[in-house]
Amino acid sequence: MIKVGIVGATGYTGLELIRLLNNHPNAKIIALCSRVNTGKAVIEEFPSLIGYVDLDFIIPDDKTLFECDVIFFATPHGVAMNSVGQFLDKGIKIIDLSADFRIKDSSTWSKWYGIVHTQSALLKNAVYGLPEVYSSQIKNATLVANPGCYPTAIILALKPLLKANSINTKSIIADCKSGVSGAGRNSNIATLFCEVNESLKPYNVNQHRHKPEAQQVLTDIANTDVDFIFTPHLIPMTRGMLASVYVDLTKDIDVQELFKNHYQDNRFVHVLSVGVYPQTKSVKGTNNCHIGIQKSNNKLIIMTVIDNINKGASGQAIQNMNLMFGIDEGLGLEQIGLLP
């Protein structure tokens, strides 16, 4: 049984980790950390866990964490980088859901996140945790940087085309929409009900922190520089993400066949039939990504949907854990989408 600890257990991604791990046959949560709620019963904060979790919150410095086989960090950026070293030294595996280890160049990271990266040595050893791209590296990793939600949706849309060297890598447009849970569980005027209800708005246009992260991976896949225009939008729903990615084809190829062949062995990526377009509700509460494709002459639109706090965060983190421990990557992640 894999002994699990979660640091930052009261955020949305921390709660989602608890929900999913509760049904994992090979994992047991032994430590849930929260400085604000230390000593408080988990079920007092989250009544939905009554009957499932019988733990109290502990401080992130509690010795119980050193009994874990793996620790998930579901913390704001800047926390994990200064905390994970002590656990790695003891042979404990780390999966970081923050952005601390996603960007390989520390100066680039500091530019986008506004603070100095203090652990550039660890950046070199961190593996980017997108199983559909780096599964073999994840299997041998001790420190995994769990991807952001937007990069996950964008990269899965573009990977088959980049591998086939079939698109213009400088004219890509990524138009993305995310549910409000992507902003986290904190006090923020911009995400209050009255601010987001019955409204749709773009934000951080082409300046979102997820852009350099996605660019880094796309460039690695293509083996050439990749650039794209990125417009994220906030939509008035809790969970879900839709990425509509527009590209110019440089080859006359059967894109439907390309995508189906490329993802045929990937458990959680499903290419829809011609003329069928993905919808967020189909993947709500799951680790799945649905992909729809529309071609018009040399123009192609790839549409991907994911649950932003499942495949876009916690579900993907558990998929990574499964790979790191050499077990079936789908364990604990076989949920059907929540309908209606």
UniProtKB/Swiss-Prot annotation:
Gene3D superfamilies: Dihydrodipicolinate Reductase, domain 2, NAD(P)-binding Rossmann-like Domain. Keywords: Amino-acid biosynthesis, Arginine biosynthesis, Cytoplasm, NADP, Oxidoreductase. The lineage of its organism: Bacteria, Pseudomonadati, Pseudomonadota, Gammaproteobacteria, Candidatus Pseudothioglobaceae. Belongs to the NAGSA dehydrogenase family. Type 1 subfamily. This is N-acetyl-gamma-glutamyl-phosphate reductase. Catalyzes the NADPH-dependent reduction of N-acetyl-5-glutamyl phosphate to yield N-acetyl-L-glutamate 5-semialdehyde. GO terms for cellular component: cytoplasm. The keyword Amino-acid biosynthesis applies. The active site is at C149. It comes from the Bacteria. The keyword NADP applies. CDD domains: AGPR_1_C (cd23934), AGPR_1_N (cd17895). Pathway: Amino-acid biosynthesis; L-arginine biosynthesis; N(2)-acetyl-L-ornithine from L-glutamate: step 3/4. It catalyses: N-acetyl-L-glutamate 5-semialdehyde + phosphate + NADP(+) = N-acetyl-L-glutamyl 5-phosphate + NADPH + H(+).
